[in-house]
């Protein structure tokens, strides 16, 4: 592991952490989730489905499925269907990323204040983080949906920093997806916050763009 980068990241007094693909090695399940759900409904999914819904919240994805694929179910029921396909993985098998865990533990030892900001389900997120032993290190687990925002704009990170009274110029935002890194960089440009990007199996095609946007980058898969 890059011990120098771990030390640098852990030196930030405030940290905002994405979960899937950043803390947890879970993106392999999300990549196929939408397609798996449609197949379960007897619908052939389009090839570009994963990239289409990547930046959406669960609620937005469910509404999209209603509109585009004629799923005649309420949004909460569609979301429940999504989650039923991956809940067991969160509760039993999805591991933490070693590099992320090392930063989190060292940052906690340094007295850093940290939160999670995810587009995933809050309860499943907490269960998974508890199982891998990382939940106690975070002040709170926030979801973009509960904040009434998404990760396509830097505004959500600015809102979190304001809500938790994080000093922006001393805050590190940890993300993996291109759209989220771009939004985090936007927040950084506005506030002075820095961005650490994590490489993942789901972002390899965008990695050069991600590296160009982030202040720091963790290269290993």
Q: Where are the predicted features?
A:
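Sparse recognition of residues in long alpha-helices and their boundaries
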Residues: 35-37, 50, 78, 98, ...
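Hydrophobic residues in well-ordered beta-strands that form the structural core
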Residues: 25, 116-118, 197
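N-terminal helical cap/lid subdomain that shapes the substrate entry/recognition surface
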Residues: 5-102, 106, 110
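Non-catalytic, surface-exposed connector residues within folded enzymatic/regulatory domains
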Residues: 76, 94, 119, 150-151
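Asp-based, Mg2+/Mn2+-dependent phosphohydrolase catalytic module
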Residues: 1-13, 105-108, 121-122, 126-221
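Residue-level detector of anion-binding/catalytic polar loops
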Residues: 44, 113, 190, 194
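Conserved SAM-binding loop
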Residues: 23, 96, 114, 149, ...
């Amino acid at each position: 592991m890059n011990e120098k980068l771990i030390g640098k990241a852990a030196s930030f007094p405030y940290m905002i952490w994405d979960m899937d693909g950043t803390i947890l090695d879970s993106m392999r399940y999300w990549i196929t989730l939408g397609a798996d759900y449609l197949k379960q409904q007897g619908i052939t999914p389009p090839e570009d489905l994963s990239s289409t819904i990547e930046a959406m919240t669960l609620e937005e994805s469910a509404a999209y499925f209603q509109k585009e694929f004629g799923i005649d179910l309420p949004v909460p029921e569609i979301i429940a269907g999504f989650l039923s396909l991956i809940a067991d993985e969160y509760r039993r098998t999805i591991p933490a990323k070693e590099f992320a865990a090392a930063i989190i533990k060292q940052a906690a030892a340094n007295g850093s204040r940290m939160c999670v900001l995810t587009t995933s389900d809050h309860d499943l997120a907490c269960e998974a983080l508890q199982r891998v032993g990382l939940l106690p290190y975070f002040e709170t687990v926030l979801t973009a949906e509960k904040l009434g925002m998404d990760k396509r704009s830097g505004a959500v990170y600015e809102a979190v920093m304001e809500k938790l009274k994080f000093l922006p110029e001393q805050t590190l935002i940890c993300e993996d997806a291109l759209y989220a890194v771009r939004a985090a960089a936007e927040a950084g440009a506005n506030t002075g916050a820095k961005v650490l990007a994590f490489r993942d199996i789901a972002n390899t095609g965008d990695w050069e763009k991600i590296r160009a946007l982030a202040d720091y980058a963790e290269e290993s898969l």
